[in-house]
Amino acid sequence: MAVPKRKTSPSKRGMRRSADALKAPTYVEDKNSGELRRPHHVDLKTGMYRGRQVLEPKEA
């Protein structure tokens, strides 16, 4: 059975847990429509991603 050889220091434990904190989602302004969208995601209103039409735009 795997057992730790040394005690994990509070610093190491804290560094490991630093990724667990909740962060506010980031948004960028779309160049074409001016709407807010997540970075590296398709704009759902226009269906554009990186200058290409990848989805059919939603009808309003």
UniProtKB/Swiss-Prot annotation:
Ranges that cross the membrane: none
GO-annotated cellular components: large ribosomal subunit
Bias-annotated ranges (Basic residues): 1-16
Stretch list, region Disordered: 1-60
Claim: ATP-binding is one of the keywords in the record: no
Record InterPro entries: Ribosomal_bL32 (IPR002677), Ribosomal_bL32_bact (IPR044957), Ribosomal_zn-bd (IPR011332)
UniProt keyword terms in alphabetical order: Ribonucleoprotein, Ribosomal protein
GO-annotated molecular function: structural constituent of ribosome
Classification via Pfam families: Ribosomal_L32p
Ranges of biased composition (kind: Basic and acidic residues): 28-44
Top-level taxonomic group: Bacteria
BP terms from Gene Ontology: translation
Family to which this protein belongs: Belongs to the bacterial ribosomal protein bL32 family.
Annotated NCBIfam families: rpmF_bact
Descriptive protein name: Large ribosomal subunit protein bL32
UniProt source species: Chelativorans sp. (strain BNC1)
